[in-house]
């Protein structure tokens, strides 16, 4: 996503990170950036109705950390498996909550993990699965 000054999100159970964009972005532009970075089949979101600059990210089901993201001064949280009530509550806090899909938000780390394991365990061949892929599809209502 091009975040700078990435750090642990307080209250994020050490699995959610936060950082800032080089410049504030309008929501449509940020959604496009998320789409290009993660390659989801679709994006669900609620609009916090403010420009996006400070962003929290949590791979997989980290929607429950939206309050921590808002308390940490974030404008948006990018994660997956967000519940409807979380969207409502995030919007009430002025936080843009983005559900980019479970697979896309976790799969993005796989190349980094492969390199880490290969470096950590010299001589170990690490192979990414060729069959593990996104299984969720979206039907576009005509």
Range-by-range predicted roles:
Residues 1-142:
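Hydrophobic structural segments
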């Amino acid at each position: 996503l091009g975040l700078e000054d990435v750090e642990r999100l307080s209250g994020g159970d050490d699995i959610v990170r936060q950082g800032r964009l080089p410049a504030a972005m309008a929501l449509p532009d940020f959604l496009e950036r998320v789409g290009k970075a993660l390659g989801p089949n679709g994006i669900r979101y609620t609009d916090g109705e403010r420009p996006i600059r400070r962003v929290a990210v949590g791979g997989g089901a980290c929607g429950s950390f939206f309050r921590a993201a808002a308390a940490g001064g974030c404008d948006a949280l990018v994660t997956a498996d967000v519940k409807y009530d979380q969207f409502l509550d995030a919007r009430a806090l002025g936080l843009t909550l983005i559900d980019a899909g479970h697979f896309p938000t976790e799969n993005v780390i796989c190349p980094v993990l492969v390199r880490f394991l290969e470096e950590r365990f010299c001589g170990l061949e690490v192979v990414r699965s060729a069959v593990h892929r996104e299984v969720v599809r979206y039907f576009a209502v005509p």
